[in-house]
Curated annotation (Swiss-Prot):
Protein name per the record: Snake venom serine protease homolog HS120
CC terms in the record's Gene Ontology section: extracellular region; secretory granule
Signal peptide range: 1-18
Alphabetized UniProt keyword annotations: Disulfide bond, Glycoprotein, Hemostasis impairing toxin, Secreted, Serine protease homolog, Signal, Toxin
Gene3D superfamilies according to UniProt: Trypsin-like serine proteases (2.40.10.10)
Similarity comment: Belongs to the peptidase S1 family. Snake venom subfamily.
Protein's organism: Bothrops jararaca (Jararaca)
SUPFAM superfamilies: Trypsin-like serine proteases (SSF50494)
């Protein structure tokens, strides 16, 4: 397992400067090692993403993190180069997606076997209600910490951002639909944001998983350019149906 980790880290370092397809936290600080027991690191050998453990057997992320390559899922990870004692590796047993990636950027992954809850592994609660505009929410991930040149840290970074009305994002990014199952969040002054390799990571508001890092237009952390996050609350029936074993679960219209 140590040899696998060494090889994986070398590949990540080699590929990090070419990474373009997913969204790290700019303007944040190193996360506390005990702050993110639900945070999953998804690695396919070409790109890496984040995800959120929502129970012992399921991880929630976004569709764009599936590049059809074999995926390893690390739980309980903090420092990429040095495994925690309770760190675990799993593989996808099943992946469930919604059609139309731009409209429904969400993916539910069933792990090949359940993880063990521990000091650094524990699920995050799904939302009981949608988040309120004006909420201060938490973002985190191993994505790039510099917007102009990709610089990927060894430990995840965390930051606080604000939740805005969706119309703010419509005004900031051309071509967005009038209505959307997305949340709009960021810092209008710029300087704090998710970015390359943060895709699939959590937007945490009031201690619950309210959003998933999904999409942005142009460069990260720009003034008046908040990002878009898949609104988890709108997908609760779909998520719960799949976990319950439904083969006919449909995405929200």
């Amino acid at each position: 397992m140590v040899l696998i980790r060494v090889i994986a880290n070398l590949l990540i370092l080699q590929l990090s400067y070419a990474q373009k397809s997913s969204e790290l936290v700019i303007g944040g600080d190193e996360c506390n090692i005990n702050e993110h027991p639900f945070l999953a690191f998804l690695y396919t050998g070409w790109i890496f993403c984040s995800g959120t453990l929502i129970n012992k057997e399921w991880v929630l992320t976004v569709k764009q993190c599936n590049n059809r390559r074999p995926m390893r899922i690390y739980l309980g990870m903090h420092t990429r180069s040095v495994p925690n004692d309770d760190e675990e590796i799993r593989y996808p047993k099943e992946m469930f997606i919604c059609p139309n990636k731009k409209k429904n950027d969400i993916m539910l992954i069933r792990l090949n076997r359940p993880v063990n809850n521990s000091e650094h592994i524990a699920p995050l609660s799904l939302p009981s209600n949608p988040p309120s505009v004006g909420s201060v929410c938490r973002i985190m991930g191993w994505g790039t910490i510099t917007p102009s040149k990709a610089t990927y840290p060894d430990v995840p970074h965390c930051a606080n951002i604000n939740l805005f009305n969706y119309t703010v994002c419509r005004g900031a990014h051309a071509g967005l639909p009038v209505t959307s199952r997305k949340l709009c969040a960021g810092v209008l002054e710029g300087g704090i944001d998710t970015c390359s390799a943060d895709s699939g990571g959590p937007l945490i508001c009031n201690g619950q998983l309210q959003g998933i890092v999904s999409w942005r237009g142009g460069s990260c952390a720009q003034p008046h350019k908040p990002g878009l996050y898949t609104k988890v609350f709108d997908y609760l029936p779909w998520i719960q149906s799949i976990i319950a074993g439904s083969t006919t679960a449909t995405c929200p219209p």
